[in-house]
């Protein structure tokens, strides 16, 4: 189980990313069609936004344990939790296959 502070930090990053998403997106679109001087100004504005508002700072975490590695996007679970839940028939449509 991940520490509670790490899970809360990730939630804070997600909230910041949602808050600044449209602003960052519009600035990035403007920078594609602008002159060099305008690009410098847009770059300065992007740099002045909070660091944690960038989408690259986000990590996917397991929804049950908070584990940051080996996550399946379709389920939002880490690999070992997915396996345990699939064996317990808690995930609809998932069958254990072995051959």
UniProtKB/Swiss-Prot annotation:
The record ties this protein, via InterPro entries, to: Ribosomal_uS14 (IPR001209), Ribosomal_uS14_bac/plastid (IPR023036), Ribosomal_uS14_CS (IPR018271)
Location of this chain's protein in the cell: Plastid, Chloroplast
Where does the record place the region Disordered?
46-66
Is the DNA repair keyword given for this protein?
no
What Gene Ontology cellular component terms go with this record?
chloroplast; small ribosomal subunit
Pfam families per the record? Ribosomal_S14 (PF00253)
Q: Which PANTHER family match?
A: 30S RIBOSOMAL PROTEIN S14, SMALL RIBOSOMAL SUBUNIT PROTEIN US14M
Q: Which family is this protein grouped under?
A: Belongs to the universal ribosomal protein uS14 family.
Describe the task this protein carries out.
Answer: Binds 16S rRNA, required for the assembly of 30S particles.
Q: How would you summarize the oligomeric state and partners of this protein?
A: Part of the 30S ribosomal subunit.
The protein's name: Small ribosomal subunit protein uS14c
Q: Which organism is it from?
A: Pinus thunbergii
